[in-house]
Amino acid sequence: MTISSFLRVRHSLAAAKCVLENAKQSFSSHAAFAEHAKLERIRNIGISAHIDSGKTTLTERILFYTGRIKQMHEVKGKDNVGATMDSMELERQRGITIQSAATYTMWKDHNINIIDTPGHVDFTVEVERALRVLDGAILVLCSVGGVQSQTLTVNRQMKRYNVPCLAFINKLDRTGANPYRVLGQMRSKLNHNAAFIQLPIGVESNCKGIVDLVKQRALYFEDHLGLTVREDEIPQEMRAESDERRHELIEHLSNVDESIGELFLEEKTPTEQDIMAAIRRSALKRTFTPVLVGTALKNKGVQPLLDAVLNYLPHPGEVENIALIEKKGKEPQQIMLDPARDGKSPFVGLAFKLEAGRFGQLTYLRCYQGVLRKGDSIFNVRSGKKVRLARLVRLHSNNMEDVNEVYAGDIFALFGVDCASGDTFVTNPDLELSMESIFVPDPVVSMAIKPANNKDRDNFSKAVARFTKEDPTFRFAYDTDIKETLVSGMGELHLEIYAQRMEREYNCPVILGKPKVAFRETLVAPCEFDFLHKKQSGGQGQYARVTGVLEPLPPHQNTTIEFTDETVGTNVPKQFVPGIEKGFRQMAEKGLLSGHKLSGIKFRLQDGAHHIVDSSELAFMLAAQGAIKSVFENGSWQILEPIMMVEVTAPEEFQGTVIGQLNKRHGIITGTEGSEGWFTVYAEVPLNDMFGYAGELRSSTQGKGEFSMEYSRYSPCKPDVQEKLMQDYQIAQGNVVVDAKKQQKKKN
């Protein structure tokens, strides 16, 4: 290298460093800009993916390149610091993101709010909450692992909340990287109309840069931090492939976009602007998914991804947000919220996450309409409580920055607000409107829990009270039959994390029992009931009669219970119907076969009778309970168990062993695939048969096998499992085992 070229390189590095320092120093002015940014210059995005796909590393790079942090850190805390977005000590140790950290940053005069979500399936509720309040998302896929179980879950969640997304195929530098295979999986498994808008220039150790198919240029990321992005001609050896992939991109767009479709049919070549506009239109409608590539760890492809967020993901004004106006005695009416950032419409916000911070309860909100200023009073629509706001803060991981006001489209946090996740807040209590609530899945695993030392009971109570309020999938109950305290959640890891947090944050070590599956009891066939509750013991008596049908719901509704009032006339006065429903729901809390909840049943109240003096709501509640007991005696019942979707990846030589293990655990193989010495098997396995599988898989694959699982559905359990559950329950109740067999009715 000549002296002049060396000086040029040193000068460019110094310039890049200077630019970065200026970005850091001017971020206070960025915060002021963020408060008053135009609607078109705001993006609310989430970063979602399967565990260990590189989401948190990608977020760390985004924060660095936008000047939000001064230096990058590794995720698993190898540098004793850990990633910025992993603020909890437990997260830094495990190298997984447990809570959705929120932050905001600036890129090319646009304010970007980012939620970094967990990838582990046990923390699915965090992903649900994040997607509910976002306008767009980046779906991160590993170029080796491809589409995995949690990717399918995240994809379903994005579909539920209609969130447009970009796909970013990460980890091009890893051995076995194959972005083309991942694109094929996106089309076949996720049913995405997806195409590359970038191509990698080499993979694994030869990963040099990327080709931008829209601009038809090669991009190289220079110096060891990748700060300088150099444009160049597409390498000669890649031009044929680039032309072919660009044509494929136009073809996929022409299937969903009219303008490009016309140009395609007329065999005209669309311009760069035509393609960008078509990608944006179709991405917003969720009819096309642009696919980008890169490696966050090696600092390649992050800046073009940020450009794509601005170019192809929606601003708050392009997303339809609906609220419900609810008047007593009338059907809820849907209205569109006004996304304008002018403060002319009244404030409407949604609480999507609760957290116990250092200064009290922290409530994360999204402002959907209007403006909220420090010192304003807001009302909780559900509870009617009024709160005056002393502080408004923006979040950067676990750091807070005070702001004076927030506008429609902003994500922010409040202190000292007593509410639940999914509550709607307004400044005008006469509005009587609420946002749709956040979907919360039911827990599938329970464990007995108790403090290791009796002296820690107070801290234990505080921890449980806080965690159950923060996380609606973490449940706490006392079982009077077995005299044990139970916690329930989305998996073993979910409950273990909370146990460790109790010890770490509340100095309260706990003892966890063996995992227990949340079985359910349901009817096999409809069963009629006609029950009279009559009691006379001096003074006013009790008289109530209920008749109707208890029937099973369709399989896709077998985790819910329903009550319908089909009575005509005044045989059952309307003021007593709520008592009947209450009696039914109380009985549904505990079945007679195994002591588990009833689900997948519908109580149809068809007729009854009352007494002018002796009837009361209590009498009808007891009559409903008696009716359910009669159906227990006369109906045909079965026990349901949760079925999990399991994905196992291991070296090919262990394929037979792994499939044998899954068959032994009563699994049904639904698919297999393999590439470059590794295979992946997909199966549906009862959760009750999955305990202890992690250790078995490790020992049988020399520690190389990995698996993940997520809840799929409830299905009838095998006869021998049902028999054992019934016997165990009867023994626990102190009844004769033979009586349990009498409880099991023949299936119709």
UniProtKB/Swiss-Prot annotation:
GO CC, one annotated term: mitochondrion
Protein's name according to its UniProt entry: Elongation factor G, mitochondrial
Superkingdom classification of source: Eukaryota
Entry binding sites for GTP: 49-56, 116-120, 170-173
All residue ranges annotated as the tr-type G domain in the record: 40-318
SUPFAM superfamilies per UniProt: EF-G C-terminal domain-like, P-loop containing nucleoside triphosphate hydrolases, Ribosomal protein S5 domain 2-like, Translation proteins
InterPro entries: EFG_II, EFG_III, EFG_III/V, EFG_IV, EFG_V, EFG_V-like, EFTu-like_2, G_TR_CS
Gene3D superfamilies: 3.30.230.10, 3.30.70.240, Elongation Factor G (Translational Gtpase), domain 3 (3.30.70.870), P-loop containing nucleotide triphosphate hydrolases (3.40.50.300), Translation factors (2.40.30.10)
Primary localization: mitochondrion
Entry coiled-coil feature ranges: none
Compartments in which it is found: Mitochondrion
MF (Gene Ontology): GTP binding; GTPase activity; translation elongation factor activity
Signal peptide: none
Similarity comment text for this entry: Belongs to the TRAFAC class translation factor GTPase superfamily. Classic translation factor GTPase family. EF-G/EF-2 subfamily.
Presequence positions on this chain: 1-14
Species per Swiss-Prot/TrEMBL record: Aedes aegypti (Yellowfever mosquito)
GO biological process terms held by the UniProt record: mitochondrial translational elongation
Main function: Mitochondrial GTPase that catalyzes the GTP-dependent ribosomal translocation step during translation elongation. During this step, the ribosome changes from the pre-translocational (PRE) to the post-translocational (POST) state as the newly formed A-site-bound peptidyl-tRNA and P-site-bound deacylated tRNA move to the P and E sites, respectively. Catalyzes the coordinated movement of the two tRNA molecules, the mRNA and conformational changes in the ribosome.
One Pfam family it belongs to: EFG_C
Keyword set, alphabetical order: Elongation factor, GTP-binding, Mitochondrion, Nucleotide-binding, Protein biosynthesis, Transit peptide
